[in-house]
Amino acid sequence: MADPISEPLLSHLTDDSGVNEKTRLEALTFDKIVEQSLSDFGFWQFFQISLVGLALLFDAQQIFITVYTDAYPTWHCLNHTICDPSASDICKLPRSAWEWDGGSQGKSVISEFGLECSSSLLRGMPSSAFYIGAIVGGFFLALIPDDSLGRKKLVLFSTFAMSITSISVIFSTNVWIYTFLKFIIGFSRSQTWSYALVLISERVSTRWRPRATMIPFTLFVLGFMSLSGIAFLAQDSSWRYLYLYTSVPAVFYCIFLYLFALESPRWLHMQGKDKEAIDVLTKMSPKEKAYLESVVSKLPLKQENFEQAPTYSIKDFFFRKWAFRRILVVMIIMFGLGISYYGVPLAARDIDVNIYLSETLNALVELPTFVITPILLERFNRRSSVLVNTLLGGASGVLCFVLSILGKTEIAFAFELGTFFCARIGFNLMAVFMVEMFPTCVRSSATMMFRQALVVGGACCPLIASIGRYIPSVSFAIFGIAMSGLGMFVLILPETKGLSLCDSMEEQEKRDQAVNTSHVC
């Protein structure tokens, strides 16, 4: 059998194939088979996307869980002669003069490990270890070749490792063990988002990709919101129970994922497993069963003649000029969006508004973006959507700074929400755009680097936000300028609207050359 990447899977169909005359006469590539069989979006496709997307729900819970487990607990005085809760410094009082509210010191990591008088660096060390683990894991896991395990197994292993480590956190006896386990959790889940996005995008047709990729993003936000409810119900319990309540369901989820989730048909095709790929398409689209049966009857079954496709990994981005240029530009844009997405909520304290209200509204404002993003993707091209969005977000950030200086707090806060809203829209747009720019063989690695740029941008946020302590709200101007300035690099990227996904680097190069020559999609 010839190279399965470029060779048409079926050159013609016989008269009894049940396919129309036009289809019988044209060469039928695997990409055409995927587009034809997944042209409709049924319940089973929605189920498969939601099943994989649930990994992001549990991922979100582990990202934000330290907001509750590592919180500084409230306390009250026992000896009012020497203790005044409104004026006393807890670290200057004898331990017998005060007590934690609820009478239990195990409600928080701070109280259980006696960190109430420790430095802010030590108290924040577990959270920092989590993000350091995410950065280290992102770079390390990006070195794994795309064809090593498969999309489904990568989602499964990352979620399972995160869940098991989260359960083991309850056995921590000191802050050092706890910090180490938080590092492992961050390392394990560092690429869960990337793995899930790639698996989902490769199991839908071009028509439905913009809407389908918004489902896991919505589940991510719901995971953050559900954590608040779980934490509220467990507020009188030890912080260890919160880890159990979020990680045990994730373990059961992994079992369902293993039993019911389907592998990416495009990845199976890249491995020469065409018959298995057709079986997956048949399960996902029962209405196209007759069409797919006609295809599978023509498949070559002798696997010994299959020529192994070349192995691709992150190094291919450096050996191909076009790939390196694209991934570099994508990372520049995502760095700017990452600074804004993670930094704007962090700097909200510089505006004279209720911090709890501002954080709640920042979370809620994300939900409409998952409805608006598909509309933008379907009606406008990718580059102009990203460009206009980042320019609007940048202008909103600068206006937030100016209005805050002028004392117009309420209007400034509205523009703060607008900046965060545009950052989230830009993130959603770039996620779909990036998937379409790279072939199946390196798509997972590209998504990892996309995610890493976002995380590195987020890691710079605390430093930028701290500037607001000296010049109030100036951080919003910096976030806005970064978003709009770096967002203009999108003009370098090729337009991908309406184009199907390629599988190999060679196929991507041929299509790009054809598009550049003919100027048509």
From Swiss-Prot:
Keywords: ATP-binding, Glycoprotein, Ion transport, Membrane, Nucleotide-binding, Transmembrane, Transmembrane helix, Transport, Vacuole. It is found in: Vacuole membrane. Induction: During drought and salt stress treatments. GO terms for molecular function: ATP binding; transmembrane transporter activity. Glycans are attached at N79. ATP binds at I200, S201, E202, R203, V204, S205, T206, R207. It is a multi-pass membrane protein. Its main location: membrane. Residues 1-37, 145-154, 201-213, 263-326, 378-385, 434-447, 495-521 are cytoplasmic. InterPro entries: MFS_dom, MFS_sugar_transport-like, MFS_trans_sf. One of its GO terms (cellular component) is plant-type vacuole membrane. The keyword Transport applies. Expressed in roots and stems. In the stem of secondary inflorescences, localized to the phloem. Also present in flowers, specifically in the stamen, in the filaments and the connective, and restricted to major veins in leaves. Gene3D superfamilies: MFS general substrate transporter like domains (1.20.1250.20). The chain crosses the membrane at residues 38-58, 124-144, 155-177, 183-200, 214-234, 242-262, 327-347, 357-377, 386-406, 413-433, 448-468, 474-494. PROSITE patterns: MFS (PS50850). Residues 59-123, 178-182, 235-241, 348-356, 407-412, 469-473 are extracellular. One of its GO terms (biological process) is cellular response to water deprivation. Belongs to the major facilitator (TC 2.A.1) superfamily. Organic cation transporter (TC 2.A.1.19) family. High affinity carnitine transporter involved in the active cellular uptake of carnitine. Also transports organic cations. This is Organic cation/carnitine transporter 6. It comes from Arabidopsis thaliana.
